Curated annotation (Swiss-Prot):
Domain of life: Bacteria
UniProt xrefs under PANTHER family: RIBOSOME MATURATION FACTOR RIMP
Organism: Bacillus licheniformis (strain ATCC 14580 / DSM 13 / JCM 2505 / CCUG 7422 / NBRC 12200 / NCIMB 9375 / NCTC 10341 / NRRL NRS-1264 / Gibson 46)
Pfam families per record: DUF150_C (PF17384), RimP_N (PF02576)
NCBIfam families assigned: PRK00092.1-2
Disulfide bonds: none
Keywords from the named record: Cytoplasm, Ribosome biogenesis
Protein family membership: Belongs to the RimP family.
The name this protein goes by in its record: Ribosome maturation factor RimP
Length: 157
């Protein structure tokens, strides 16, 4: 059910975003406690402000009310992805080159399933992350198809 909702909402929101020159980062449809939330994360090269989020929310809300693809009651939230933006598409990884990232893999690579460090290279097939182990830097090569989850990571160093 959740994937169908996400696919439907993605198709509905894309023309709105194209018109405003914004990018769809992610969509979540989740139940928290007794309430359902439809969260749409948007961005642009210059970031997004509250007015752009409101425009997208209003336009999408109209389309959702018309088509009524979600039967249960839910709250619609439109926002920026924040500082720890998810990396979902190849283009996201390219934009994140040189930045601090967190990557979780489906299976252990060199004994670990979680990595945090600088995204040093990406070629569409492999993700290269430079991590600090004690006082030395080590480069880990992760096959792109083994990445379960990836996001930018805020570093306080």
């Amino acid at each position: 059910m959740s994937n169908k909702v996400i696919d439907t909402v993605s198709e509905m929101v894309q023309p709105i975003l194209d018109n405003l020159q914004l990018e769809l980062v992610d969509i979540e449809f989740v139940k928290e406690g007794q309430s359902w939330f439809l969260r749409v994360f948007i961005d642009s090269d210059d970031g997004v402000d509250i007015e752009e989020c409101a425009k997208v929310s209003e336009a999408l809300s109209e389309k959702l009310d018309e088509a009524d693809p979600i039967k249960q009651n839910y709250f619609l939230e439109v926002s920026s992805p924040g500082a720890e933006r998810p990396l979902k598409k190849e283009a996201d990884f390219m934009k994140a080159l040189g930045k601090n990232v967190y990557i979780k893999t489906y299976e252990p690579i060199e004994g670990n399933k979680e990595f945090e460090g600088e995204l040093s290279a990406f070629d569409g097939e492999n993700v290269e992350v430079t991590v600090m182990i004690k006082t030395r830097r080590k480069t880990i090569n992760i096959p792109y198809d083994k990445v379960a989850k990836a996001r930018l990571a805020v570093s306080f160093n």
